[in-house]
Amino acid sequence: MLRQTTKRAFLGLASQNPTPFPVVSRLYHPNVIDHYDNPRNVGSFDKNDPNVGTGLVGAPQCGDVMKLQVKFDGSGQIIDAKFKTFGCGSAIAASSVATEWVKGKSVEEVLTIKNSQIAKHLSLPPVKLHCSMLAEDAIKAAIKNYKEKQDKANGETVETIDSTYLHGIGS
């Protein structure tokens, strides 16, 4: 009898909703879906270009890997950005948003982008916050790489960005 009642209840549910399980897109904010379905700036630049900074970061807890590259003009403004991400939809969306937000900005402006801003824009749940942290870390790593290339090209001692300063920005 329990089996018949369960079967009737399930069939009744199925007749009201052809898919008794929630559609995955209902679990994500529209901004995540938009950037996942239509990611901006996918690709890469030549990492040996002195005007390109490359940041490669990963999250061991989930296996996400993010490569973000920024291309500068002669005056220190970011003119383009590209990414390649191996990871979940939230990581791809965070990468896409990051590349959009860095364009047209200077190094100083870019270093003010915080993971909390990306997370808020995408309405990421707590379990996905590491995706926005990866995006922020990738931006910082790309800027660090670019500065190291510029210092080396100018014959200067390679100056690294103070990690305390970088972590303070991301807080």
Swiss-Prot record:
The annotated pathway is:
Cofactor biosynthesis; iron-sulfur cluster biosynthesis
Q: Which Gene Ontology BP terms does the record give?
A: iron-sulfur cluster assembly
Q: How is the cofactor bound?
A: Binds 1 [2Fe-2S] cluster per subunit.
Task: Read off the transit peptide span from the entry.
Answer: 1-49
Top-level taxonomic group: Eukaryota
Could you tell me in which tissues this protein is expressed? Answer: Mostly expressed in flowers and pollen, and, to a lower extent, in leaves and roots.
Select a single GO molecular function from the record's annotations and give it: iron ion binding
Q: Which cofactor does it need?
A: [2Fe-2S] cluster
Q: Which compartments does it reside in? A: Mitochondrion matrix
For this protein, the record's Pfam families field holds: NifU_N
Keyword entries, A-Z: 2Fe-2S, Iron, Iron-sulfur, Metal-binding, Mitochondrion, Transit peptide
A GO cellular component annotation in the UniProt record: mitochondrion
User: How does the annotation summarize its subunit structure?
Assistant: Component of the core Fe-S cluster (ISC) assembly machinery.
The record's family statement is: Belongs to the NifU family.
Q: What does this protein do?
A: Scaffold protein for the de novo synthesis of iron-sulfur (Fe-S) clusters within mitochondria, which is required for maturation of both mitochondrial and cytoplasmic [2Fe-2S] and [4Fe-4S] proteins. First, a [2Fe-2S] cluster is transiently assembled on the scaffold protein ISCU (ISU1, ISU2 or ISU3). In a second step, the cluster is released from ISCU, transferred to a glutaredoxin, followed by the formation of mitochondrial [2Fe-2S] proteins, the synthesis of [4Fe-4S] clusters and their target-specific insertion into the recipient apoproteins.
Kindly provide the name given to this protein in its UniProt entry: Iron-sulfur cluster assembly protein 3
Gene responsible for this protein = ISU3
